[in-house]
Swiss-Prot record:
Membrane topology: Single-pass membrane protein
Similarity-based family: Belongs to the complex I NDUFB11 subunit family.
Compositionally biased spans, kind Basic and acidic residues: 66-77
Transit peptide, residues from-to: 1-29
Organism: Bos taurus (Bovine)
Protein name: NADH dehydrogenase [ubiquinone] 1 beta subcomplex subunit 11, mitochondrial
Residue spans crossing the bilayer: 89-109
Domain of life: Eukaryota
Purpose: Accessory subunit of the mitochondrial membrane respiratory chain NADH dehydrogenase (Complex I), that is believed not to be involved in catalysis. Complex I functions in the transfer of electrons from NADH to the respiratory chain. The immediate electron acceptor for the enzyme is believed to be ubiquinone.
Gene Ontology CC: mitochondrial inner membrane; mitochondrion; respiratory chain complex I
Record lineage: Eukaryota, Metazoa, Chordata, Craniata, Vertebrata
Pfam families for the chain: ESSS
Keyword Nucleotide-binding attached: no
Length: 154
């Protein structure tokens, strides 16, 4: 059913193309499900004439190949001197300034989340406790004598 409808539509398109003088290509379809072959019928035994091609020159060429004029083009400008200058400026700022100054900036950023400060403070506290004969760590974070608990009301 589908193959028959497809063949009918194909024949109609070829007939319309032939009556209007449009170039029509011979088309042949093969259905994968029903293994039917659909080919257009010959239209009154006439073979359509080959289309004539007319050369039309583009008045404004948009796509110029810069490599014909300058084989070492970097794509920044049509003029070779400006192209090389722009390439050098881009690479100078891209590598020298961004990489060198950027890495220096990252190296001198302040202490992230104060990790270095916390380590120095812990080392200072350990030295103080060892010098005064105190244990390095206590089980109580707060002095138990200073904590006031509510009274038991049974």
């Amino acid at each position: 059913m589908a193959a028959r409808m497809l063949g009918l539509c194909g024949r109609r398109l070829l007939a319309v193309a032939a009556t209007r003088g449009l170039p029509a290509a011979r088309v042949r379809w093969e259905s994968s499900s029903s293994r039917a072959v659909i080919a257009p019928s010959t239209l009154a035994g006439k073979r359509p004439s080959e289309p004539t091609l007319r050369w039309q020159e583009d008045p404004e060429p948009e796509d110029e190949n810069l490599y014909e004029k300058n084989p070492d083009s970097h794509g920044y400008d049509k003029d070779p001197a400006v192209d090389i200058w722009n390439m050098r400026v881009v690479f100078f700022f891209g590598f020298s300034i961004v990489l060198v100054l950027g890495s220096t900036f990252v190296a001198y950023l302040p202490d992230y989340r104060m990790q270095e400060w916390a380590r120095r403070e812990a080392e200072r506290l350990v030295k103080y406790r060892e010098a005064h004969g105190l244990p390095i760590m206590e089980s109580n974070c707060f002095d138990p004598s200073k904590i006031q608990l509510p009274e038991d009301e049974d």
